[in-house]
Amino acid sequence: MASWGGEKRGGAEGSPKPAVYATRKTPSVGSQGDQWYLGYPGDQWSSGFPYSWWKNSVGSESKHGEGALDQPQHDVRLEDLGELHRAARSGDVPGVEHILAPGDTGVDKRDRKKSIQQLVPEYKEKQTPESLPQNNNPDWHPTNLTLSDETCQRSKNLKVDDKCPSVSPSMPENQSATKELGQMNLTEREKMDTGVVLLSGNDTLHDLCQSQLPENKESKEAEQDSELTSEEEQERLKGCENKQPQKTSQEPEMAKDCDREDIPIYPVLPHVQKSEEMWIEQGKLEWKNQLKLVINELKQRFGEIYEKYKIPACPEEEPLLDNSTRGTDVKDIPFNLTNNIPGCEEEDASEISVSVVFETFPEQKEPSLKNIIHPYYHPYSGSQEHVCQSSSKFHLHENKLDCDNDNKPGIGHIFSTDKNFHNDASTKKARNPEVVMVEMKEDQEFDLQMTKNMNQNSDSGSTNNYKSLKPKLENLSSLPPDSDRTSEVYLHEELQQDMQKFKNEVNTLEEEFLALKKEDVQLHKDVEEEMEKHRSNSTELSGTLTDGTTVGNDDDGLNQQIPRKENGEHDRPADKTSNEKNEVKNQIYPEADFADSMEPSEIASEDCELSHSVYENFMLLIEQLRMEYKDSASLPRIQDTFCLCEHLLKLKNNHCDQLTVKLKQMENMVSVLQNELSETKKTKLQLELQKIEWEKELYDLRLALKQENEEKRNADMLYNKDSEQLRIKEEECGKVVETKQQLKWNLRRLVKELRTVRNNLDLVVQERNDAQKQLSEEQDARILQDQILTSKQKELEMARKKMNSEISHRHQKEKDLFHEDCMLQEEIALLRLEIDTIKNQNKQKEKKYFEDIEAVKEKNDNLQKIIKLNEETLTETILQYSGQLNNLTAENKILNSELENGKQNQERLEIEMESYRCRLAAAVRDCDQSQTARDLKLDFQRTRQEWVRLHDKMKVDMSGLQAKNEILSEKLSNAESKINSLQIQLHNTRDALGRESLILERVQRDLSQTQCQKKETEQMYQIEQSKLKKYIAKQESVEERLSQLQSENMLLRQQLDDAHKKANSQEKTSSTIQDQFHSAAKNLQAESEKQILSLQEKNKELMDEYNHLKERMDQCEKEKAGRKIDLTEAQETVPSRCLHLDAENEVLQLQQTLFSMKAIQKQCETLQKNKKQLKQEVVNLKSYMERNMLERGKAEWHKLLIEERARKEIEEKLNEAILTLQKQAAVSHEQLVQLREDNTTSIKTQMELTIKDLESEISRIKTSQADFNKTELERYKELYLEEVKVRESLSNELSRTNEMIAEVSTQLTVEKEQTRSRSLFTAYATRPVLESPCVGNLNDSEGLNRKHIPRKKRSALKDMESYLLKMQQKLQNDLTAEVAGSSQTGLHRIPQCSSFSSSSLHLLLCSICQPFFLILQLLLNMNLDPI
């Protein structure tokens, strides 16, 4: 806050009056701008701004101490307010100065100079980095510094509604043309003596003078237009479009009020105060939009003024003293439009000028030397009463829109002032009020008429301008006083020419503007060239200034003078003097202003030259003016202005010295900023490289994820295929198990059948043995019979020899015997038929036996094949089970390896995360280092908020990770329990497999035993076959012998013709024999049927047992299949869950990395966006970033702790799971051992029990067989006794037959002797065959006539009887021996055929004995032949 004032002065009455003070409110950072107040303590609008508040605010913000801002206020009494109003309306600046500061002007000027010299460096020292021009202005350059940076800074922030008497608050929003200035109040045409001075640039005189050169104006305007970027344009246009519809109803009314003549200055200020509060609330964007609206309205108003007041040419001849005073007035008005120097776009900094309008009115009637410009209007004060408002952004925006809109009307940025002293009838002639002639422009296009020469040498143009103006100054003396109109017309023509030139040059500006955007790299070179050109131009200007031939121009090159209507009270010479003063003033000010644009080394020498040249110029002007205005009033004023110019030059020199120091400081700052920019570029490159690396890593991670997903899919497909194959194999195994069970049942059935076959074979072998014994006995009997027959034949021959003599007597007997023989032959034929039937039956039985044996062989072969298949399937199943077990073990190993790999991957990922964190920490440190030099407070707050969000996200993520870790721990516990259950199931399956393997071993042993037994049976069968062959051979030999015996029997029967009784007995015996034979055959058939039934029953029992065992095998296979399914399901679930857990862990880790990468990307984007803005608050950012780093370190430390805890918990759980698995494995192994031992013990006990049962059965069978043998022996004994009785009876019959034979023999001998001669031939004819053996006996002469000796016959009969008795004894002995042997063999064979009953043995013995008895009877019958 600043204030200006003066000392109190008494009025005419001498009464004290309240003082009026002018204040400016300097708002805090972030407000819209500086706001000026002019008032007195009694006003309502000024009551809220006491001096104490102003002092405190200044002391708190600027820390000036006892500087310029602590100067006393200018007190104005209420009586002088009317005069102050009139002077302000009429444009009488000296009158206003006189009212505000009636004391010595020199002292006040010195005080103001000192205050300004103190204010500028102090304000600069206390400027924050935010307020520096290089940070906020893109067109800033160190060479463009003005005399007062404070005023420049304040002029940037001025508002439209600042408190000045000539302010128009705001414009309507529908006006499109851009304006830089507030609208001034203008009087009517009859009362208007002066115009408005418009402040359109900077507040410094340096920029004013420099900008008055046309070439400088052109170059600066072009540079200003070129340095506007597209981003600023878009922002401003958007701000204008979006935020204009505010305060439209109030602004035109305010403008109309300000246009009226009678409206005072101060009543506007309360409304301005209200608008200020509204501006603070609305913000920056609304402020920009309303400023734009003000510019638009000002542009239209100035266009109307220009049309209303056509600009005539001002007189070029004015007194030198008036020009000096004019120079002071303009010097007091800080304004500069174009302070852009080419090449400043690289540093993104430029000054922006603001123009201030003064308005003076020619109603001051008492001018004097005191009415010269007061220090109150000094340019270094930063603001004046009549400052309207403008902003640096106005000028940039106007220049930009001027390039876009060529035909829109604009205003001039700088107007030179022209004071005119007029004489009144009631006042002295010496007093002439100063009139400020307003120079303005109609068109906005003319505002930028010299921008084409932006990249050209601006200073060379300025020198040419001075050269062109030199003849004008020389021609001033030659011009007559009446040449005012011609000069005005000439100036008007020049103005029109310049406007046309500007219109032609606007089109080229657009092309150059686009080219300048592409030539950013060459701007540094252009800066250096422009600096050298400025130096060269400064030397040229020093020469031109010493000659005094330069003429000043406005900042825009549009120094058009608005014509003033001459009243009746004004004279033509006054107009001339005012115009000459204007020219002299314009001649002086460019020199002073241009000195500021030169290098610091040239300022001192040039200031010395300026002081001398100014003095010479004044003297020349005095001579030229001659004696027209050399009265007592004008000469002191000229002298005062001269003194003021000297003071100003001194101030300028001092200020230039300060500027040199400041320039050096700013150059150092620029170098530092350039270094910082290079560092920021490097950091940008590093960040971009890091981004690229992170993107590559993300791409790699995504590829790895895709590959893992593909591998998982392939694994799932393989797993499904394997599961299907396993199911198919399980089904096949089930089928195989079923077939195995069926085979086992068949094996058992076949084993039983083999046992039965063995038993049957044993029986057959026994029968064969018995038959062989019988055959041997029969052979022995036949041998005996042969011997007996031979002896009988011999006896018969002897008897025939003896009975030849008795043949004749026996013819009749022979006939009888022949009949008997026929009968016997018939009987023999019947016997042969019976024998054939018996043989056929035996053959059929043999065929049946052979067929049974072949069926048994086939069955054995099938059984062997089935056993082989079973063995193969068993081996295959064993191999499959072993393979499955190996697969299970391999899968367990793979799972363990996968778990280990997962652990390793987790460790590797943790290491990578740590490395990423280290990188992130390094990157964050680098970013922090770059941020500490570049970031702003607001963006830092955003980053802090983002960091807080990230911190919250990290907390949320940590909580989520903890929850996920808990879920994973639960899943691990569930998996462990499932693994335990699976292991238990594995152990159970292993136990079942062990049991099945034991069962299979038993089956194999049984099979091996059955094979051995089968081999034994085959060997026995082969032996039996050989025996059968021998038996058949023997049977054939027996049949042959039987045939021989039959032939012999025929012979014997021929001899037994006479034994009729014997025939009858033989018939009886034959009938009995036949009955016995039939009974024996029936018994054999019954026994065979019983055996068949018993075999069928046994087969049924075996089939039942086979079915039962098959059902048990099916149950076992079903249980096995269920266990396999459980195993497969467990195998499927365990790896899938492990993979799912690994995938979740990887996804979590990737999500963490992605979140961190996203956070880093956001940070990088915010860093890149906020580089420029965050430069000014380095210290605060450092502190904040240190805190952030500490908090991040804490967060990372907490993260590490949580991760370490999670890892430890997982490792502990895994170790516990492994220990439990090991324990369970040991327990299961022990259980297996115990189960095996239990199985072995149970099997042993079962075997012992079965052995005991078998032993008990064997003992029982032995006892029963012994009893049976005893009973059979007793029966055999009884039978034997009966047979002995029968034999005794037979022997008695034989003895009787012998007696009968002896009697018959005696009778035969008698009959033979009687009928020898008669019946010899007839006997031979009738019985040739029978009588053939007796032929030799008949021829034998010796035997015919012999006598019969009966003693010899008796001896032969006795021998026969003795022989038969011996045979009977042998037979008895053999029978007893056979019975004893059969009993022993029966005892030995009872265990194999325990089911064989005693009745069957009895029947077998009877069947065996019957043919033996028959043979004996035959032999006995044969022994009964008549001897």
UniProtKB/Swiss-Prot annotation:
Residues 490-545, 648-1129, 1155-1309 form a coiled coil. Residues 224-234 have a biased composition (Acidic residues). Pfam families: CCDC144C, DUF3496. Signal peptide: none annotated. Keywords: Coiled coil. InterPro entries: C144A/B/C (IPR040118), CC144C-like_CC_dom (IPR039497), DUF3496 (IPR021885). Residues 543-552 have a biased composition (Low complexity). Residues 129-150, 167-178, 453-467 have a biased composition (Polar residues). Residues 1-32, 87-189, 213-261, 453-485, 528-586 are annotated as: Disordered. Residues 1-11, 528-537, 563-584 have a biased composition (Basic and acidic residues). It comes from the Eukaryota. May play a role in preventing the formation of kidney stones through inhibition of calcium oxalate monohydrate (COM) crystallization, attenuating COM-induced apoptotic injury to renal epithelial cells. May exhibit antilithiatic (preventing the formation of kidney stones) activity through crystal binding, hindering the crystal attachment to renal epithelial cells, a pre-requisite to initiate inflammatory response. Belongs to the CCDC144 family. This is Coiled-coil domain-containing protein 144A. The gene is CCDC144A.
